[in-house]
Amino acid sequence: MRFNGFHAATLGILAAFVAVPAAAKTISVSATTPDANEKLQEALILAEPGDIVQLGAGVWKLVDGLSLDVPNVTVRGAGAGEGGSVLDFTGQQGAGEGLLVTSDDVYLTNFAVLNTKGDGIKSKGADRIVYHQLRVEWTAGPKETNGAYGIYPVESTDVLIDSVYVRGASDAGIYVGQSKNIIVRESIATENVAGIEIENSYNADVHDNIATKNTGGILVFDLPSLPMQGGQNVRVFGNEINDNSTPNFAPKGNIVASVPTGTGVLVMANRHVEIFDNVFEDNGTANVMIVGYRYEHKDPKYQPLPKDIVVRDNQHGKAGYAPKFAGGDMIAAAMGGSIPPVLWDGSGDAIVLDKVGVLSLNLPDVKTPQSEAKPSPADLSKGTPPAALPAIKLPDAMEAKVR
């Protein structure tokens, strides 16, 4: 009996020992070794949950994209500036992403991604992902051949994008699609077609960012024929949205190719969007545009109208002096040289409490061609705004990573 008891106890101890995961480790990767590129991808493959892949200072000249499919991994560089950790894809042979993440609880911080043929950093189906202090840039400036998206999480729950810089994306610098529970904050988007875009997503706070010198500063879209529809509950607040004057360089056929140069915030077919406490300045078409989806589609479930849009407590500087939509120049001339800061196509509903003018195109039916517009001033200050949206709260563990 004593033997059996001892044996059972020993087995219990061994079982407990086996159940304890290996201690998290730091995998350091240098940019200066002859096999630096291979070692970097190897580190991402061999990492285990809890590990840190530490990138040294230097430049990796990469010809292939990188991938990470291990959960709960941190990829940390030595900084996102020129003297930090730089992943340079100028010589990339394929057309894919620079870095693709497909696992949960990943933390990306303090490195740069340059000149990818495709998207800069993409995550797909990666819940609780954190993008922090990153730089994604196409260094030759705006070009149609640049990658589409800089920072690109899609199909995710709980997304935090904090203190990133994106320049030169031919679609959107910072894009979050088909996701829910999102915060985009304290970031800079410049010289992209769309600076920041929230598309077909639920529950997003976009705040304290700078969107400047894009074609359009911040876009909130809902599009047809996607698995997740009914985009709603988005707050755009506390942002500086100025001088979005870059000519549209999106490839033809992209939905953002229709964004007029000089757009501050553009809401298309979304529901319950609050735009408040922003500073607008020098957006040649409009500071705020609210429109329906006016393109052909074959999705019977799609709802193309903007609803419950609220615009309040914003500061409006110069706007509407160079409207880049069909007939905009003639409308501006007829109105003394510029159109009001807020432009509404007349579809859906919105409340504008800012003490500025609103121009309606009086096109309530999205099937009516824009050529039939009958522009006139509109008063959208009446009515009762919907209940204010709550702040987005992400898991404490995500916030702790960036503190």
Task: Spell out what each predicted region is.
Residues 50, 78, 104-115, 127-140, ...:
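Right-handed parallel beta-helix
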